[in-house]
Amino acid sequence: MSWQQRVDDALTARRATDTLRRRYVVSQGAGRWLVANGRQYLNFSSNDYLGLSQHPQIIRAWQQAAIRFGVGSGGSGHISGYSVAHQALEEELAQWLGYPRALLFISGFAANQAVITALMKKNDRIVADRLSHASLLEAANLSPAQLRRFIHNDTQHLSRLLQSPCVGQQLVVTEGVYSMDGDSAPLAEIQHIARRHHAWLLVDDAHGIGVTGDEGRGTCWQRGVKPELLVVTFGKGFGVSGAAVLCSESVADYLLQFARHLVYSTSMPPAQAQALSASLAVIRSDEGGERREKLAALVQRFRAGVNASRFTLLNAHSAIQPLIVGDNSRALRLAEALRQQGCWAMAIRPPTVPVGTARLRLTLTQAHEACDIDRLLEVLHGTGE
């Protein structure tokens, strides 16, 4: 088979199963409204859960820091790219979340890949929730360690997998809030099982940090859990981008030596780090608390209004509210029907989610108003799908 034939066959297979992804060009993609092709839509596809991407205080912090530092970091943090802005943000994050150290990464994908590939060796075992993010599962597959996956949130299955003999070390991998289902992991029980088997725990709290817990400290804090490795990302609740790994002093020193995604990548711009510090200040403030309360009320309003006889609503109380429709083509038709009525939502299909669980992944944000939720419900229940 030629290279071109391989490419063509893969695309043809995606088209045949209604799983071909496409991008949409937007003029504005975060916040209450999405603007595309000159039309304005109520935006139910953004991860900007607290509406902070448009916050004037955070925008101003980025602008002022760009004037001071320039628009790029100029290099890896191991060379010349680790600024006082990066250092300050790491210290603020560590203090806020109660860890000795925090290390910044350019993305959550990079952070997850870096930690797993740096730590895991031959004869080790990774035991990951079956619905873990692609960055976690890909890193596990690429590492020399054995990968075993436990049934989603099934702690008995997790325990059985950890009980089987392992010559090396074991790492349990889970998420705080799951990106496609919107539900939460039983973190306290998972941590208890991991410790019983002398395994370390890695929690990716991309969708919980900033949004849940006291001062927005996330799902782990809310559940009284402190994993050995906590990954937080900044493209959701923080409204910016990037990520950090919270860990012990020695693990941080180890990652600085062996995490190739950290060593060989240009650091995030110092202006971005400054904006993240400003975002953290808002998250921890009374205003941040008010934003979280408003978001929680909007989620409750939506869940109370969904017609359960037409849509399968998962046990999700986060900003992520998936409506399971099953069939790929139906999910695409439903998303298009919503767009025709001025509501922007995306159809999520395999391989992102399991076969037969195609869905509308609706995300609610603090930027929405109650009338926006009512309009979404009206459109959903008025469609023929």
Swiss-Prot record:
Pathway: Cofactor biosynthesis; biotin biosynthesis. Keywords: Biotin biosynthesis, Pyridoxal phosphate, Transferase. Its cofactor is pyridoxal 5'-phosphate. Pyridoxal 5'-phosphate binds at residues 108-109, 179, 207, 233. It comes from the Bacteria. CDD domains: KBL_like. SUPFAM superfamilies: PLP-dependent transferases. InterPro entries: Aminotrans_II_pyridoxalP_BS (IPR001917), Aminotransferase_I/II_large (IPR004839), AON_synthase_class-II (IPR050087), AONS_Archaea/Proteobacteria (IPR004723), AONS_Proteobacteria (IPR022834), PyrdxlP-dep_Trfase (IPR015424), PyrdxlP-dep_Trfase_major (IPR015421), PyrdxlP-dep_Trfase_small (IPR015422). Pfam families: Aminotran_1_2. The modification N6-(pyridoxal phosphate)lysine is found at residue 236. Disulfide bonds: none annotated. One of its GO terms (molecular function) is 8-amino-7-oxononanoate synthase activity. Its EC number is 2.3.1.47. PROSITE patterns: AA_TRANSFER_CLASS_2. It catalyses: 6-carboxyhexanoyl-[ACP] + L-alanine + H(+) = (8S)-8-amino-7-oxononanoate + holo-[ACP] + CO2. GO terms for biological process: biotin biosynthetic process. The keyword Transferase applies. Substrate binds at residues 21, 133, 352. Belongs to the class-II pyridoxal-phosphate-dependent aminotransferase family. BioF subfamily. Homodimer. Catalyzes the decarboxylative condensation of pimeloyl-[acyl-carrier protein] and L-alanine to produce 8-amino-7-oxononanoate (AON), [acyl-carrier protein], and carbon dioxide. HAMAP family: BioF_aminotrans_2 (MF_01693). This is 8-amino-7-oxononanoate synthase. It comes from Salmonella agona (strain SL483). The lineage of its organism: Bacteria, Pseudomonadati, Pseudomonadota, Gammaproteobacteria, Enterobacterales.
